[in-house]
């Protein structure tokens, strides 16, 4: 095998090498069935066992909270932006959103197409470089739910705690930091995540929802846009992305092997601290974008003195085997995405490269 790249892509992102190797070993002949998991009927016992195991394993990692269902949906988190207000925003209610950056903005944009919305808090005034404090969040009396993006991948800002919304369901877009740390699922009515950052390959969207919220979806909605379709049919109403779900299950096993969410969080903090220290101790050569208290452990954003120098950095990094360090096109700059599967060794190599680049250009 050729040398693995130092993969800092924002998504699709690095997958654990051990998971890729296990999948490779089982790719043609899954558990001596003479078939790949991709060739099996989704109604068959072998695939259904994988499907059910992935659901159970995910809830177990979250402490087995009662009254929640795991759904596997297609269409990415972007489809959830619309499904959420379609299912939960009733006549006379308002959808409340915390505005923290690019992804929160997209979620709000979709909700506005469905019904009335309210910005409960916003960090737009800081150019999304600091997150609103929890006590600044103001819900309307007729709030249907509060939607919050736990981690903004583009800006690089992450909530470290979540608001108590009382009887108003809290809905979390956790696409880029789900299972990167422990959190109390009981605070949420629903969380969702596209798989392609911390859970597996693209093509699967995981939704974890409180069962009482989805007992019955609005009757006027199309079948595949109703949450109760997935609940009542165990996400098997139509053909699911079976290989993606198999991969999610393998990634969940890998997380278990690393000490669960506590073990993964410890590893992630160590990686993030290493890179942030390199930025903060560079004498201003590298400048972190986000206020320290709002910094993400998943997406580290930083700048150099000029766009020209940043282009040089990206070009030089690619020559050394680094991938994905260019910032998002909407904000520019530089970004290192260090999701669960990115090894500490890759972060060490990045810090060494940053130091070398600083010496040669500083």
Curated annotation (Swiss-Prot):
GO biological process assignments: L-serine biosynthetic process
SUPFAM superfamilies tied to this protein: PLP-dependent transferases
Alphabetized Pfam families for the sequence: Aminotran_5
Sorted UniProt keywords: Amino-acid biosynthesis, Aminotransferase, Cytoplasm, Pyridoxal phosphate, Serine biosynthesis, Transferase
Gene3D superfamilies, alphabetized: Aspartate Aminotransferase, domain 1, Type I PLP-dependent aspartate aminotransferase-like (Major domain)
Catalytic activity: O-phospho-L-serine + 2-oxoglutarate = 3-phosphooxypyruvate + L-glutamate; 4-(phosphooxy)-L-threonine + 2-oxoglutarate = (R)-3-hydroxy-2-oxo-4-phosphooxybutanoate + L-glutamate
Annotated EC: 2.6.1.52
GO molecular function per UniProt: O-phospho-L-serine:2-oxoglutarate aminotransferase activity; pyridoxal phosphate binding
Membership in a protein family: Belongs to the class-V pyridoxal-phosphate-dependent aminotransferase family. SerC subfamily.
NCBIfam families: PRK05355.1, serC_1
UniProt-recorded name of the protein: Phosphoserine aminotransferase
Organism this protein belongs to: Niallia circulans (Bacillus circulans)
Origin organism lineage: Bacteria, Bacillati, Bacillota, Bacilli, Bacillales
